[in-house]
Every structure is written in structure tokens, then in C-alpha cells.
Curated annotation (Swiss-Prot):
Superkingdom of source: Eukaryota
GO molecular function: cysteine-type deubiquitinase activity; cysteine-type endopeptidase activity
Region of interest (Disordered), residue spans: 160-196
One Gene Ontology cellular component annotation held by this UniProt entry: perinuclear region of cytoplasm
The enzyme's E.C. designation: 3.4.19.12
Gene3D superfamilies: Cysteine proteinases, Ubiquitin carboxyl-terminal hydrolase 26/29/37, pleckstrin homology-like domain
Reactions performed catalytically: Thiol-dependent hydrolysis of ester, thioester, amide, peptide and isopeptide bonds formed by the C-terminal Gly of ubiquitin (a 76-residue protein attached to proteins as an intracellular targeting signal)
Record field: compositional bias (Polar residues): 170-181
Enzyme class: hydrolase
Keyword Hydrolase tagged: yes
Sorted UniProt keywords: Cytoplasm, Hydrolase, Immunity, Innate immunity, Protease, Thiol protease, Ubl conjugation pathway
Name of the molecule in the record: Ubiquitin carboxyl-terminal hydrolase 29
């Protein structure tokens, strides 16, 4: 029996410990009592890990890349996964042959389930290790991304992942909770950039594998032939950090696909069969349709394409032994880790598990009925957040109770107090502040609402100005007069307004394209809505608005902070209302904000903090004419000494969960008991003459709570577009002349041919104007009918007035947009079809690694230019993902630094879809 010894860098994943760091090690094969084991000795020499190979190999995948280095992926049946990187070509080939022989040997003895692997100290064996055999390690090794293809061999992963289903006994999980220092201190696994990389050449020898170990031993001295052929079928895109899927048992797996795979003749998948050689590139692959599950595929592709979201799922070192099989975080992580290199059959299993887990909570997704993508997105985010809260609660309970069986990560260094960041809260959660101010007495109610997305209405404008995401946001944030029962003066007239108190990394905007007609039938609005490349939120923010959580931060967001209200801010709110103001605090019982203080201890405590002012101090302040300032100072001093308010559980936007409710126009504001209210009655503050126009004031009070409450659904029924703030008189006329001259210049220029390459620094005024030119020069939009528009009135050419309106909006985005409050388009989920009861969902996603846009249409993936995407989705765009500019540029820099010098992957050129192929049910 021969013994192989190779040197490389190894990364190990198991269910209980998660993914380790990539570390240098000596890998050796050893035979003991007719059993073959793999011994991994780390360079430190302190620890050795032993893995059973006999009758325990599920798949072996070998990949070669440039510079004669290779990597090998070994998946074991006992839910252990090994990624061996930076192997020499010769070592990788020999190790692959060795493992293939063991895998195909049918005369092996059954594997001992209790001998999965062990970790033990081996200080005495340190002398036996040849230190000169290790590679030299750089201080910061460059971890290369490599394409992961699935072999067509029936012995590979495509087969192995299903072996434990259908009544077969489950393998005993390996006892991975050990005292291995290399595992216990893995709080910072290899950074997972979750970028799709440029594909590399997959080289596989066409020589036959040796039929015995003796043949392999003889073959070690033979020179490998120079001729290689590709024999693979998979995706050239992958993740840096790789997790292996757990055993999919019968209770968790979906063994019968609901819909056959697309055939080559399917008009929804115009994918040509191209012969591959050693230099060819594999076409990207999306997700298979399980039967009307295009809504799920489109949403998941958009989520997985956000690098920060993928990092938070994969690289936190989550103790998987605390996560049940039916948890959404488990199934999503498996799908995210394997989607770029596993077979379509395995993708079906993983997608089926995601659907099954979500259906267990939301029964509406359990069958084969068509569902709404926004409903699925909301349920997915809500359920994932709940899983993370349960995980942190479980770990905290185990730590407080001194549970001996708790995860070893809880007892090593800073991990004992570690709180795992929720990917939903860190990436999508923002805070809106609602202000309700009585017009008669100035009594103000302030409410902070954490949300994961904004649902905005499609307003029918009387102006000929074209609709866009930007001006729809303007209408959403426009001040509105409402009937509201004031608790102080009993009047019913108030002014309501929303502003951002905390921004998110990614802003999700849901466009309500569905509503009820006069016959109370649900219909779709195919009206054209322009999709800007950039959004400016500066009009909806103030100086107290908090920026998104930085990428480098792992601290939980949403910590309760001291409420600080300045006299200037309060004056700005109430300046047009009354010259006599006084600060008080009490509960709210309005029709608009039904909150019961006796059922919410947190709210009562918050109100007590605001209202327990000293009567003596209050009287002195009234005599000195400074009641407002004194009350605020007194409140701040009391609040500093208080502990943080406990975080309360909350709900998603329940007003947007089903189709009939979700597309309601003009819905009323819904609040939950977790919402904190502050009522302010202001008095005796001089009124500034410049603050007479109430609609020009900004937000004023800032809260920051770690919870998700119900978002405002259809709060405004605006009748006109808000005019951007600006100077008057000559300055305004000059601005208009400049804008018109720019527009005229645009209309005289011809559109540039070809696909425009994305520039990482395209955030200046000049670049945005060029982007405007590219979009507005596409005057002939007749082809939009084939791309999803069923409204004949929307197929004509944009007139000059609409063109000028779009250009003015973009100019406003440039000149009014604060870089700290600007957002960049990264994904669009579209519904192709004229009816809410039929149609098809697709997603357009920006690839940070390739710096290009791709359309995901179930299994089909094709490249598309950003300009063409914006035009094609004018009538069908449904959910929009915008990323904060600072986060976008940082992720782009990381992607550029990690890119490999290889050619771009071959993809299907984006073309117009045939006829009504996209109108078929998902």
C-alpha cells in the first residue's frame, strides 16, 4: 500500500464547527487495518486531524488553474468537507487518482461511524514532519477564486447528496466539537466576498484512472501528458468560502421535482450548446424552476448577489449545532454555498428545502400556485431575522446557565460574548421617523419605525411628467394633512411626514403595481416608471440621520440610545403652527396611531423618562421663559442614567402580505405595540419668519431601536409631485437655462453603440449626465412590447417634455444628492405579464466581480447592458435594490483586488425574448 504526502493549504467544514481558515498543512494518506485514512498535520505541528476515507467518500472534484497550481474538493459522507488549495499540479493529480480509486473500490469494509475524525496533540510527532516540505506563507496570502464544476461522473456530488434519502439510515454526525485550537478560534474565517469570479480553464486528463493502488504507485513516476479535454458541466462562478451541504434526509429533502428541466428548445431558455475545449468558458447557470417558483428564484438571485449579505451568512462562524434542520438560515446557507458549482439536480433539492422551510411558516407558498415575489421576499427576510434572534437567545441562555454542552466558541476568548449579526438587520433594515403634528396647538407625536423595505404607490399624476422611482419617493415622503385626534386640544387636523433616522446598506423599494379596480378585481398597472441609476435621499434626511452600518463593523445595530432634542429642531417642526409652545409627554390614543400604553412596558418606561420632570424646575423655567430648553436638558440628564430599553420583538409589514392587501392604495398607517411614541407639546418659542412654510422643514428627532416593526403601507395619497427645494428668482431661472441647454445637447447627439462598461467611480455630475444621455437617446421604444409591456399606450416614443422631465430629475439627483445619502442601483426583480394571476418573474443583477449586469431567467443567465435593462424594465420593474454609494464603492474595490487575471466568462448575449415566451406562467 502506497502512502501519499502532499503539501498545501486546507480548509475544513463540518456541521458543528462551520468553516475553518485556510491553513498550511501536510496531507498524508495512511492505511490501518484495511481502512484508509487521511491525516492532516497543520504546520504548527500541535494538532492533527484524521478523516476516514474507506467507504466514506461522497465526491472528489479536481480543478487546475494558472501557474501550475490546483485545488481539490473532497466531500465525505459524514458531513465533512475539505478544500485543499495551492497544490502542485503533480501532487493534485496523484491525490485525485488515489481518492478516485478508494471511491470506486466496491470491496471495502463498512465505515465505522464512530471513527469520523479525531483531534489530538502530537508534539512528539513534530520531529517527524519534514519542515522543508511546506510552502512559504505570505503574511497575507492571496486566496484565489476558482471555478467549481460538477463532474458528469455518477460517483460525484450529483449522486452523493441524495444517498441518505428514502429510508436509508442516517450517518451518525461526526463528533466535531473538539478541543482543536485551529477550530475553536475560527471567529474570522476566510473572507467570503461572494463575488462571481472570472472563470478559469478546467483541465482534466483524458487518461484512464488506474484500476488499482499498484497502478497508481507505478504511475507516480510517469510524466503527465500534455493533452487535456474538458468534461464538465457547471458554473464558472463561485464563492471564496465554501460550505458543504449537510445530509439531506427524508424529512427535509424534496425528492420529486415539481417541474421538468427546461429543454433546449424551450423559448424561455435560448441557451446554445457550444463545444468546449480547454480554453472555453462554461455558461452561467441559474436556478431550476420547481413549478411556478420563478418568484423564489428571482428573489434569491437578487439577495445572493449582494456581497455583504452573503458574507454575513457565510463568514460569521455560526455554531451550526445550534441550528435545526428546519431553520431558514441553514437551507439558505447551503444553497448559497453550493449554487455555483453543484448540479441542477442538487439545486432542485436545495431550492426545495428552502421552499419547504418557508412553507412551514407561510402556508401560501406550500403548493404549486403562483405567488408574489414581494410577499416571498418579506417572508424570507422576516423568517431569517427570527432565526438569528433565536440563535443569539439560545447562546445567551446557555452562557447564563453555564451549559456544559454549549458551543466551544462560547468559551474561547471574545467569542464568549459574541453576538452574531443578523444579515437582514445589518444590510436591509432602516428607520423611518413619522411626525404627526397638530396644526392647532403644535402637539407632536414622533414615531420611529424600523423597516426592511419601502412600499410605494403608483400615483396618477395630472402633470405630463413621467413617473420615476425618484419622484415616487418624493410623493411618498411628501407632507400630508390627516384627520388626527389631538390629545391636547381635541382638534382633528394634523400634518404628517416621514424622514429617515437611520439608513441601510441596501434600500429595497417595492413598487405597488397591483390595485383593485371599480369591480374589486385585482389588476396590474403596466405604466411606465423610469428606473434611475442613482437615488438621492438627501431630501428625506437631516443632520441627525445615521449612515449605514459599515462593512468592517460586526456590532449589532439598533442599540437604544439617548433621545436628544434640541430647541432649534423643535422650533423647526412647529414654527408655522403656534408661537406659544410647551413640552409635555403622555400616551397616544389617536385613530391613526392606536397604541395601548398599558400593554407595553417599554413604552411606559420611555414615556416616564420623558414626563417625570421636576415641578419646581418647571415653574422656574416658565418664569424665565425657557421651559422648552430646560425640559430637554432635564430629559437628557435623566435618560443618560437609564439602562438601555429592552429590545422588543416586532413584525414585518402585515399590510403587504397578501395580494388583496399588498396592493391596496391609500392604506392607513399600521402600528405595533413595539413602536415607541413621544408626544411633544411646544409652547413659548419665538416663531422665525423664514420657517413659515411648513413643508420645507426636515426631520428632527432620532431614535435607534433594534427591532423590525410594521412599515407604513400606502400612507400617502398624493396629488402632485413635490418640487425640489432650491433658490428663487434669478438663481432658479439660471438653473433652468443650464438644464435646458444640457438637454438640448443630449438630443443632438447620437447614442453610442455597444455595451457601456461600468466605471467604479461613476458618481460625479458629468458621468450621471452621460448616463442620462444614453438612456434618453433610445427614443424608439417599440421593442418594449416584447420585453414585457402589454399596454399599447406605453409603446410610443418618449416625447420631448417627458425627456426633459427625466433629465431634470437626474440633474437634481446630482446637484442635491449628498454622497453620504446617495444610492446605486444593483438589482431589479421584474414581473413580465399583464395580469397578477399569470406571468413570469426574472431578476437583473449587478455582478461586482465582473462589473456587469446579468439577467437571471430561472436556469438561463445572460449578460445585459445597464441601459438596455433600464429600458426593458420600464413597464415591468417591481422590486428595486439600491446600495449605499459608500458601501458600493468599497465592495467594488474589494472585488477588483480579488479578481483573477482571466478572460470574462462566456454568456449568452442579451436579446429580445421571443413573442410571449415570458408571459407563460412561471
Amino acid at each position: 500500500m502506497i502512502s501519499l504526502k502532499v503539501c498545501g493549504f486546507i480548509q475544513i467544514w463540518s456541521q458543528k464547527t462551520g468553516m475553518t481558515k485556510l491553513k498550511e498543512a501536510l496531507i498524508e494518506t495512511v492505511q490501518r487495518q484495511k481502512e484508509i485514512k487521511l491525516v492532516v498535520t497543520f504546520k504548527s505541528g500541535k494538532f492533527i486531524r484524521i478523516f476516514q476515507l474507506s467507504n466514506n467518500i461522497r465526491s472528489v472534484v479536481l480543478r487546475h488553474c494558472k501557474k501550475r497550481q490546483s485545488h481539490l474538493r473532497l466531500t465525505l459522507k459524514n458531513n465533512v468537507f475539505l478544500f485543499i488549495d495551492k497544490l502542485s499540479y503533480r501532487d493534485a493529480k496523484q491525490l485525485n487518482m488515489f481518492l478516485d480509486i478508494i471511491h470506486q473500490n466496491k470491496s471495502q469494509q463498512p465505515m465505522k461511524s464512530d471513527d469520523d475524525w479525531s483531534v489530538f496533540e502530537s508534539r512528539n510527532m513534530l520531529k517527524e514532519i519534514d519542515k522543508t516540505s511546506f510552502y512559504s506563507i505570505c503574511n497575507k496570502p492571496s486566496y484565489q477564486k476558482m471555478p467549481l464544476f460538477m463532474s458528469k461522473s455518477p460517483t460525484h456530488v450529483k449522486k452523493g447528496i441524495l444517498e441518505n434519502q428514502g429510508g436509508k439510515g442516517q450517518n451518525t454526525l461526526s463528533s466535531d466539537v473538539q478541543t482543536n485550537e485551529d477550530i475553536l478560534k475560527e471567529d474570522n474565517p476566510v473572507p467570503n466576498k461572494k463575488y462571481k469570479t472570472d472563470s478559469l480553464k478546467y483541465i482534466q486528463s483524458n487518461r484512464k484512472n488506474p484500476s488499482s493502488l499498484e497502478d497508481l504507485e507505478k504511475d507516480r513516476d510517469l510524466k503527465l501528458g500534455p493533452s487535456f479535454n474538458t468534461n464538465c458541466n457547471g458554473n464558472p462562478n463561485l464563492d471564496e468560502t465554501v460550505l458543504a451541504t449537510q445530509t439531506l434526509n427524508a424529512k427535509n429533502g424534496l425528492t420529486s421535482p415539481l417541474e421538468p428541466e427546461h429543454s433546449q428548445g424551450d423559448p424561455r431558455c435560448n441557451k446554445a450548446q457550444v463545444p468546449l475545449d480547454s480554453h472555453s468558458q462554461q455558461l452561467q447557470q441559474g436556478f431550476p424552476n420547481l413549478g411556478n417558483t420563478c418568484y423564489m428564484n428571482a428573489v434569491l438571485q437578487s439577495l445572493f448577489a449582494i456581497p455583504s449579505f452573503a458574507d454575513d451568512l457565510l463568514t460569521q462562524g455560526v455554531p451550526w449545532e445550534y441550528i435545526p434542520f428546519e431553520a431558514l438560515i441553514m437551507t439558505l446557507t447551503q444553497l448559497l454555498a453550493l449554487k455555483d458549482f453543484c448540479s441542477t439536480k442538487i439545486k432542485r433539492e436545495l431550492l426545495g428545502n428552502v421552499k419547504k422551510v418557508i412553507s412551514a411558516v407561510a402556508e401560501i407558498f406550500s403548493g404549486n400556485m403562483q405567488n408574489d415575489a414581494h410577499e416571498f421576499l418579506g417572508q424570507c427576510l422576516d423568517q431569517l431575522k427570527e432565526d438569528m434572534e433565536k440563535l443569539n437567545a439560545t447562546l445567551n441562555t446557555g452562557k447564563e446557565c453555564g451549559d456544559e454542552n454549549s458551543s466551544p466558541q462560547m468559551h474561547v476568548g471574545s467569542a464568549a460574548t459574541k453576538v452574531f449579526v443578523c444579515p437582514v438587520v445589518a444590510n436591509f433594515e432602516f428607520e423611518l421617523q413619522l411626525s404627526l403634528i397638530c396644526k392647532a396647538c403644535g402637539h407632536a407625536v414622533l414615531k420611529v419605525e424600523p423597516n426592511n423595505y419601502l412600499s410605494i404607490n403608483l400615483h396618477q399624476e395630472t402633470k405630463p411628467l413621467p413617473l420615476s422611482i425618484q419622484n415616487s419617493l418624493d410623493l411618498f415622503f411628501k407632507e400630508e394633512e390627516l384627520e388626527y385626534n389631538c390629545q391636547m386640544c381635541k382638534q382633528k387636523s394634523c400634518v404628517a411626514r416621514h424622514t429617515f433616522s437611520r439608513l441601510s446598506r441596501v434600500l429595497i423599494i417595492h413598487l405597488k403595481r397591483y390595485s383593485f379596480n371599480n369591480a374589486w378585481l385585482l389588476v396590474k398597472n403596466n405604466e411606465q416608471v423610469y428606473i434611475p441609476k442613482s437615488l438621492s435621499l438627501s431630501s428625506y434626511c437631516n443632520e441627525s440621520t445615521k449612515p449605514p452600518l459599515p462593512l468592517s463593523s460586526s456590532a449589532p445595530v439598533g442599540k437604544c440610545e439617548v433621545l436628544e432634542v434640541s430647541q432649534e429642531m423643535i422650533s423647526e417642526i412647529n414654527s408655522p403652527l403656534t408661537p406659544s409652545m410647551k413640552l409635555t409627554s403622555e400616551s397616544s390614543d389617536s385613530l391613526v396611531l392606536p397604541v395601548e400604553p398599558d400593554k407595553n412596558a417599554d413604552l411606559q418606561r420611555f414615556q416616564r423618562d420623558c414626563g417625570d420632570a421636576s415641578q419646581e424646575q418647571h415653574q422656574r423655567d416658565l418664569e424665565n421663559g425657557s421651559a422648552l430648553e430646560s425640559e430637554l436638558v432635564h430629559f437628557r440628564d435623566r435618560a443618560i442614567g437609564e439602562k438601555e430599553l429592552p429590545v422588543a420583538d416586532s413584525l414585518m409589514d402585515q399590510g403587504d402580505i397578501s395580494l388583496p392587501v399588498m396592493y391596496e392604495d391609500g392604506g392607513k398607517l399600521i402600528s405595533s405595540p413595539d413602536t415607541r411614541l413621544v408626544e411633544v407639546h411646544l409652547q413659548e418659542v419665538p416663531q422665525h419668519p423664514e420657517l413659515q412654510k411648513y413643508e420645507k422643514t426636515n426631520t428632527f428627532v432620532e431614535f435607534n431601536f433594534d427591532s423590525v416593526t410594521e412599515s407604513t403601507n400606502g400612507f400617502y395619497d398624493c396629488k402632485e409631485n413635490r418640487i425640489p427645494e432650491g433658490s428663487q428668482g434669478m438663481a432658479e431661472q439660471l438653473q433652468q437655462c443650464i438644464e435646458e441647454s444640457i438637454i438640448d445637447e443630449f438630443l443632438q447627439q447620437a447614442p453610442p453603440p455597444g455595451v457601456r462598461k461600468l466605471d467604479a467611480q461613476e458618481h460625479t455630475e458629468e458621468t450621471l449626465n452621460q448616463s442620462t444621455e444614453l438612456r434618453l437617446q433610445k427614443a424608439d421604444l417599440n421593442h418594449l412590447g416584447a420585453l414585457g409591456s402589454d399596454n399599447p399606450g406605453n409603446k410610443n416614443i418618449l416625447d420631448a417634455e417627458n425627456t426633459r422631465g427625466e433629465a431634470k430629475e437626474l440633474t437634481r439627483n446630482v446637484k442635491m444628492g449628498d454622497p453620504l445619502q446617495a444610492y446605486r442601483l444593483i438589482s431589479v426583480v421584474s414581473h413580465i405579464g399583464s395580469s397578477p394571476n399569470s406571468g413570469h418573474y426574472i431578476s437583473d443583477v449587478y455582478d461586482f466581480q465582473k462589473q456587469a449586469w446579468f439577467t437571471y431567467n430561472d436556469l438561463c443567465v445572460s449578460e445585459i447592458s445597464e441601459t438596455k435593462m433600464q429600458e426593458a424594465r420600464l413597464h415591468s420593474g417591481y422590486i428595486f435594490f439600491y446600495m449605499h454609494n459608500g458601501i458600493f464603492e468599497e465592495l467594488l474595490r474589494k472585488a477588483e483586488n480579488s479578481r483573477l487575471p482571466s478572460t470574462q466568462a462566456g454568456v449568452i448575449p442579451q436579446g429580445e425574448y421571443e413573442g410571449d415566451s415570458l408571459y407563460r406562467p412561471a
